[in-house]
């Protein structure tokens, strides 16, 4: 996990504390809010998501290719989440992306909020929250892939553009590979992806979860399902991701060498895949970047 200048990050963080305090005060007279069995930071069972070696998809042995595709489909059905290794994205590139994220989120809050950087995609907290339990303690940039190569989006962050272009290209290859397997498992033509997927349906999101003084009470992201087709996530060693399997919340053991894959709502409509609610719960300050395929 990359270390950072704590003072610098405090100056650059959005006013999450003020907004959360306002919600606490404005709802103090209300009954406790029930947001569907919220998880907590208390000790819970740690799980290892299904770990799939994608080199099996490229094997010269047909049985190994079939077995790998079956693993992907079965993990999608049973968990809605799985991890992949040998995905083709070098650790060095992931580390460079993480370092650039730290630089980006270290920019003063007012500049992030008003400069229009990364297609004016900066957002923080939860503007629609009416209760503290609905509030996400995080900030993010949510960039359409159609904008990733536009120099005007980056301002002074010239090197960030180079890294993001590499990450977007690499993530696209992994996403298409996995989406192809899942589409075929649904009995559809693999070529269907070419008809329904292009850069306009894909996003790269950079997330930052600042240190939270209410870490026992608030999530980095509130429990949710992803309303897309497929999400591919890389997080650092800080951990914090939790998923619901059945009626139980499980802490996902971080694996910096792996990518986490989440089957989104749009795919679950067409499969018996379980609904996998997941929040981000604080264990430490950390960064992540998901890649979204949205159809």
Where are these regions (language model features)?
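Peripheral, non-catalytic segments flanking oxidoreductase cores
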Residues: 1-295
């Amino acid at each position: 996990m990359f270390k950072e200048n704590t003072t610098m990050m405090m100056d650059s963080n959005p006013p999450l504390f003020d907004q959360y305090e306002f919600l606490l005060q404005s709802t103090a007279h209300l009954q406790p809010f029930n947001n569907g069995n919220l998880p907590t930071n208390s000790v819970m069972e740690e799980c290892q998501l299904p770990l799939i070696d994608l080199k099996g998809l490229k094997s010269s042995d047909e049985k190994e290719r079939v077995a790998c595709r079956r693993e992907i489909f079965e993990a999608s059905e049973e968990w809605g989440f799985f991890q992949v290794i040998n995905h083709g994205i070098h650790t060095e590139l992931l580390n460079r992306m993480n370092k650039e994220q730290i630089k980006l989120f270290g920019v003063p809050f007012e500049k992030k909020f008003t400069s229009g950087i990364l297609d004016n995609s900066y957002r923080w907290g939860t503007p629609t929250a009416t209760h503290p339990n609905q509030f996400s303690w995080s900030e993010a940039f949510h960039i359409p892939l159609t904008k990733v190569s536009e120099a005007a989006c980056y301002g002074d962050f010239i090197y960030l553009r180079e890294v993001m272009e590499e990450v977007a290209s690499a993530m696209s290859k992994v996403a298409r590979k996995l989406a192809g397997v899942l589409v075929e498992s649904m009995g559809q033509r693999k070529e269907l992806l070419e008809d329904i997927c292009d850069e306009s349906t894909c996003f790269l999101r950079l997330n930052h979860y600042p240190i939270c003084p209410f870490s026992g009470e608030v999530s980095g992201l509130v429990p949710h399902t992803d309303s897309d087709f497929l999400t591919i996530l890389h997080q650092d060693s800080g951990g914090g991701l939790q998923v619901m399997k059945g009626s139980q919340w499980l802490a996902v053991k971080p694996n910096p060498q792996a990518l986490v894959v989440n089957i989104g709502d749009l795919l679950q409509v067409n499969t018996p895949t379980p609904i996998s609610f997941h929040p981000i719960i604080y264990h430490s300050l950390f960064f992540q970047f998901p890649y979204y395929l949205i159809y």
